[in-house]
């Protein structure tokens, strides 16, 4: 930068109002995304950031984001994440928790609350709007998986 002064007024910090988010971004069934930070809104070159809303008792379709890394910050609600070749792995996150999604990981976001929207902030490692929706067999419905052992009875067993 020797010999040249930078125009910090036009090339410095940007504030994007929550009232000016851009919903013209690739969508996944069951989820609404809106861009806050991208090249068009802030001049960003390597990052994408925005909001994600999953309605009460809803889940997204199974998808991945190619080479992109994603970070989800849970603002409110309860997130349930499923991932893997058959969505065989499950974890949950609540307000204040961060979720990291590596490249090419098939996953599904689920709102674990039946009566409240799941609100999150999403950050991606690139501007490329990659959403690859997948049609894969699911290991099982987590709502139908029961813990059965000598202490927990099988709810489908017939009483004698």
Feature-to-residue mapping (PLM):
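A short, N-terminal "cap"/entry segment at the start of jelly-roll beta-barrel domains
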Residues: 1-46, 61, 131, 135-160
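Conserved short histidine dyad/triad with adjacent acidic residue
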Residues: 32-38, 50-66, 103
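Short strand-connecting beta-turns/loops that link adjacent beta-strands
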Residues: 41-42, 67, 86, 114-115
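Short, charged/polar surface micro-motifs in flexible loops or helix N-caps
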Residues: 41-45, 55-59, 76-80, 129
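Short glycine/proline-enriched turns and hinge-like loops at secondary-structure junctions
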Residues: 45-47, 65, 93, 112-114
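A short hydrophobic beta-strand segment most commonly corresponding to one strand
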Residues: 51-52, 71, 100, 115-134
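Conserved metal-binding segment of the jelly-roll/cupin
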Residues: 55-57, 83, 93-113, 123-125
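A short beta-strand-loop-beta hairpin characteristic of the jelly-roll/cupin
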Residues: 59, 67-95, 105
């Amino acid at each position: 930068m020797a010999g040249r002064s930078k125009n910090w007024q036009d090339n410095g910090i940007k504030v994007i109002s929550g009232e000016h988010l851009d919903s013209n971004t690739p969508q996944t069934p069951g989820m609404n995304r809106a861009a806050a930070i991208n090249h068009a809104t802030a001049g960003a070159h390597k990052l994408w950031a925005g909001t994600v809303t999953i309605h009460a008792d809803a889940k997204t379709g199974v998808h991945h984001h190619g080479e992109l890394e994603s970070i989800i910050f849970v603002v409110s609600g309860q997130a349930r994440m499923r991932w893997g070749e058959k969505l065989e792995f499950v974890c949950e996150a609540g307000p204040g928790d961060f979720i990291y999604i590596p490249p090419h990981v098939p996953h599904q976001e689920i709102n674990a609350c039946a009566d409240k929207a799941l609100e999150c902030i999403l950050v991606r490692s690139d501007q490329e709007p990659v959403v690859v929706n997948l049609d894969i067999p699911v290991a099982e419905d987590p709502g139908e998986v029961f813990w059965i052992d000598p202490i927990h009875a099988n709810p489908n067993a017939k009483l004698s």
